[in-house]
């Protein structure tokens, strides 16, 4: 029998429903979009052209040439940059809990910064591997920069490209302010980077932004440029981030972590104290992270709220304000908007994914 050549592509993010697609080509990017969102594609291209001269600040190489693919039938709001094949994916539905920065501008300022990071990691030995292994070789470079640093640097980018970016919102640092003494944690620092199933830990976007912004102020430059430069040329060295930080800045990740939160806590402690009139409704079990969201009053004696924890599906519970007791009244799916009450009913929406097409996600109105 003879050998035959076969070609295929990686299946990574799901398929779109049947649509007529178009493309806009420029020397730097290619916009790929369904005809139904031509206006959004052109607006996004305008933002790309606007931020391109400055999006590579702090790095020695600008963004790579990369296509942008738009998905308008997914109500979930997100974006990402990936290899295999190389592209930027945009879910065009604006985030429900967004702020004054336009959604498409935020996506461009964040995801296009990742294209800068990828381009700086795809150098030296990593670039040589890509000639042999294709984009599989380029993905090895992503191991040379921690994910929290990549996301923190991208959040800093979107914050600097706006007057009120994500990093400037009080809610973005609220969890750290509430916990206090984060920088003095000596027992288990890894949980702040890796997460925990026991304690509430802010995600790597919040952690990365705080460390990256502190490092920028502390050293007066983007320290991840040299980390990427060293890692792409020495990928065979274990822990390239640790070696590069020690070589160029005489520091390490743990030291950066402690210095960042020591500085933040000194600032937060200097702020005027505010009164706290909150009254607990129900006693929480020890060592069990539970979230109660969006409380709605039921007369003078009860409150209905969405309850989520780590081991059960989310559900609506009614809490007796006098005794603190609670009972489950309804289980939910992935809630997409804030519940409200009207005509004696609680109304909310949930995401509903198509059985056939992963990139068709609707928002279903629900009530009880």
What spans do the regions from the language model cover?
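Short coil/turn segments that connect the beta-strands within blades of beta-propeller domains
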Residues: 300-301, 343-345
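Juxtacatalytic substrate-recognition/specificity segment
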Residues: 8-140, 146
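Acidic/His/Gly-enriched intrinsically disordered linker/tail segments
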Residues: 15-16, 102-107, 115, 120-213, ...
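C-terminal segment of classical bacterial N-terminal signal peptides
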Residues: 1-6
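Multi-bladed beta-propeller domains
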Residues: 267-290, 319-337, 367-368
């Amino acid at each position: 029998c003879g050998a035959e050549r076969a070609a295929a592509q990686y299946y990574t993010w799901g398929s779109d429903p049947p649509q007529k697609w178009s493309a806009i080509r420029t020397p730097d990017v290619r916009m790929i979009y369904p005809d139904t969102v031509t206006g959004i594609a052109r607006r996004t291209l305008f933002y790309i052209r606007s931020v391109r001269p400055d999006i590579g600040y702090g790095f020695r190489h600008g963004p790579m040439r990369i296509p942008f693919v738009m998905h308008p039938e997914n109500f979930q709001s997100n974006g990402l940059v990936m290899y295999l094949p190389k592209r930027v994916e945009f879910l065009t539905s604006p985030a429900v809990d967004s702020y004054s920065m336009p959604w498409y501008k935020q996506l461009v300022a964040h995801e296009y910064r990742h294209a800068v990071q990828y381009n700086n990691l795809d150098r030296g030995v990593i670039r040589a591997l890509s000639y042999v292994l294709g984009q599989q070789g380029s993905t090895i470079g992503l191991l040379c920069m921690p994910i929290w640093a990549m996301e923190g640097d991208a959040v800093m980018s979107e914050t600097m490209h706006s007057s009120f970016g994500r990093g400037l919102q009080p809610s973005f640092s609220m969890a750290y302010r509430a916990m206090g003494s984060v920088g003095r944690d000596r027992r288990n620092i890894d949980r702040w980077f890796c997460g925990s199933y026991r304690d509430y830990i802010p995600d790597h976007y919040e952690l990365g932004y705080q460390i990256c912004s502190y490092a920028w102020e502390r050293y007066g430059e983007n320290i991840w440029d040299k980390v990427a430069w060293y890692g792409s040329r020495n990928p065979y060295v274990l822990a390239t981030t640790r070696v590069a930080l020690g070589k160029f800045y005489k520091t390490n990740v743990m030291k950066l972590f402690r210095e960042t939160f020591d500085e933040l806590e000194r600032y937060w402690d200097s702020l005027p104290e505010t009164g706290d009139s909150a009254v607990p409704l129900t006693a929480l079990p020890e060592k069990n992270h539970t979230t109660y969201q969006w409380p709605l009053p039921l007369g003078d004696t009860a409150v209905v709220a969405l309850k989520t924890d780590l081991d059960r599906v989310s559900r609506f519970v009614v809490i007796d304000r006098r005794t603190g007791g609670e009972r489950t009244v309804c289980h939910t799916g992935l809630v997409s908007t804030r519940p409200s009450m009207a005509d004696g009913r609680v109304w909310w929406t949930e995401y509903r994914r198509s059985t056939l097409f992963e990139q068709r996600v609707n928002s279903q109105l629900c009530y009880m």
